[in-house]
Curated annotation (Swiss-Prot):
It comes from Agathobacter rectalis (strain ATCC 33656 / DSM 3377 / JCM 17463 / KCTC 5835 / VPI 0990) (Eubacterium rectale). Disulfide bonds: none annotated. GO terms for cellular component: cytoplasm. Catalyzes the transfer of a ribosyl phosphate group from 5-phosphoribose 1-diphosphate to orotate, leading to the formation of orotidine monophosphate (OMP). Orotate binds at residues 132, 161. InterPro entries: OPRT, Or_phspho_trans_dom, PRibTrfase_dom, PRTase-like. Pathway: Pyrimidine metabolism; UMP biosynthesis via de novo pathway; UMP from orotate: step 1/2. The gene is pyrE. This is Orotate phosphoribosyltransferase. It catalyses: orotidine 5'-phosphate + diphosphate = orotate + 5-phospho-alpha-D-ribose 1-diphosphate.
Length: 226
């Protein structure tokens, strides 16, 4: 496992972003784990988060893109901090763009987007916290492609939950690839998280013990990718 991956897993636990217990997801599924990117609230946390996203994007997509697009609302700060980190780490200037839940009807920046305008020929990397079932892309992709003649290079999420999408046959990220034609990648997968944290102590406690591991295994029997 690359060092930035293990560091990111530790970072999620330290930031109380990755939790284990009983949760109901947006998709309606009952899950033994939950990731809440909204728990990144301090300047130092956001700085580190942007760096991990930037490293993962660079490792998977290289430098051949122009815009980081973060869907509202959680994707907005993700796109901003990653654009900053990408410039600091790799010296490349990339723009950020996000959609508005409600279009602005006045001012120089009126319309359905904030940040940089999308232009014909732009190569776009989408950025989200986590994709469970792919529902979020149903609104976002048409908006981005309808704004200009752009190429969506790919989608980067922080955690690949490695479970089936809405169709119930392939993973949410594979489903997005089949439906929209671009690949989805993640900083880490849930398999990597489980393997790394199983029986490992954080602040004097084991994060994933035998009971939690059994619950995760049972969850993937029902929702895991085949």
């Amino acid at each position: 496992m690359e060092s930035y991956k293990s560091e990111f897993i530790d970072f999620m636990v330290e930031s109380d972003v990755l939790k284990f217990g009983d949760f109901t997801l947006k998709s309606g599924r009952k899950s033994p784990f939950f990731m809440n990117a909204g728990a990144y609230v301090t300047g130092s946390q956001l700085k580190r988060l942007g760096e991990y996203y930037a490293k993962a994007i660079h490792a998977n997509y290289g430098d051949d893109f122009d815009v980081l697009f973060g869907p509202a609302y959680k994707g907005i700060p993700l796109a901003v901090v990653t654009a900053i980190a990408y410039h600091e780490l790799y010296g490349k200037e990339v723009r950020y763009c996000s959609d508005r839940k409600e279009a602005k009807d006045h001012g120089a920046d009126k319309g359905g987007f904030l940040g940089s305008k999308l232009k014909d020929g732009d190569r776009v990397v989408m950025i989200e916290d986590v994709t469970t079932s792919g529902k979020s892309m149903e609104e976002t992709v048409p908006k981005v492609r309808g704004a200009a003649d752009v190429t969506i290079v790919g989608l980067m999420v922080s955690l690949n939950r490695m479970e089936v999408g809405q169709g119930g046959k392939v993973s949410a990220l594979d489903e997005i690839h089949e439906k929209y034609g671009f690949e989805g990648k993640a900083i880490v997968t849930m398999e990597e998280v489980t393997e790394y944290l199983y029986n490992r102590e954080h602040d004097g406690r084991v994060v994933i013990d035998d009971t939690i591991k059994a619950a995760i295994d049972e969850y993937y029997k029902q929702y895991g990718c085949k």
